[in-house]
Amino acid sequence: RWFKAHPMPAGPGQRKDRRAFEAARVNGIWQADTLFGPFVGTPARRAYLQAIIDDKSRKIVAARFVERDNAATFQGTLRMAVASHGVPEKLFVDNGGPYKNDQLSLICGGLGIVLCHAAVRDGAAKGKIERWNRTLRMQFLSTLPEHAKEGIGELNAELAKWVASYNQRAHSSTKQAPAEAFAAEADKLRFVQGGDQALHDAFMNRMTRKVANDATIRIDGKLFDVPMGLIGEKAEVRFMPGDEGDVWLVGADGSLSRIAPTDKHANASAARVKPAYSIDFGQGA
């Protein structure tokens, strides 16, 4: 009786309770993962494949090779998927850095996506994307022509053709082409309202930074100038990773003003604001 009431946790030699599942509808669940790709370019550098699959239809809603597998690049991959296929109800990912961070949580929360993480070191939980990874290794990576390894652009061009073909072939489990299965429920998709600008804003990163004594803040390792009046204060910023021209300071009223990277040479020749008054310590009492 005690053992029935207090089941023992699964040990290394015990199998986990895994049950096959499938989303009830298209965009009900997306699964995402990263796969090591080939070395490309000169000098050769490792490419990483980021991919997202729709659980119900098995359609690959986004796939691309990137030079760095990090939070910023995955946000870009997710943005591609949302722009072309709508907003999923859930996003199922692992615990790697690109998938477990505050910015992705904020983005998903703003879009109404439930962000779910698999148990640590339990890649098998994301069965559909893992099976697709195996298919891609056997059918795409193993037959990749040498010219496709000249750069990320060439590699992604080959990948796009292969993914388009994959989405048009009948899937072994559903007996239906992923693209066809997805299109059958196109009337149920939810897209971001407000067009491209609203989609862009939904993927803006948010941070709060303390303003240094030289009226700068640091974002992703780079300094940006802010108004002198904010020295010592906390500044809220919105920015698009990787785009220095898309960094904004949030005002007390919620308004946005663009800020620029610090130019130390320009600052050296800038006119200094004189104090409102001065004291001549050379005069006697």
Regions found by a protein language model. Name each.
Residues 105-200, 241:
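Charged alpha-helix within mobile-element recombinases
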Residues 167-285:
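C-terminal, beta-rich DNA-binding module of retroviral/retroelements integrases
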Residues 45, 63-87:
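Active-site beta-loop-alpha junctions of metal-dependent nucleic acid enzymes
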Residues 1-38, 123:
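Basic, flexible linker segments flanking DNA-binding modules
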Residues 84-102, 119-121:
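Acidic/histidine-rich, metal-coordinating catalytic segments
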Residues 33, 58, 78, 91-94, ...:
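Mobile genetic element proteins and their domesticated derivatives, centered on retroelements
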Residues 54, 66-70, 264:
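A short acidic/small-residue loop/turn micro-motif
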Residues 41-48, 59:
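Short, flexible loop/turn motifs enriched in small residues
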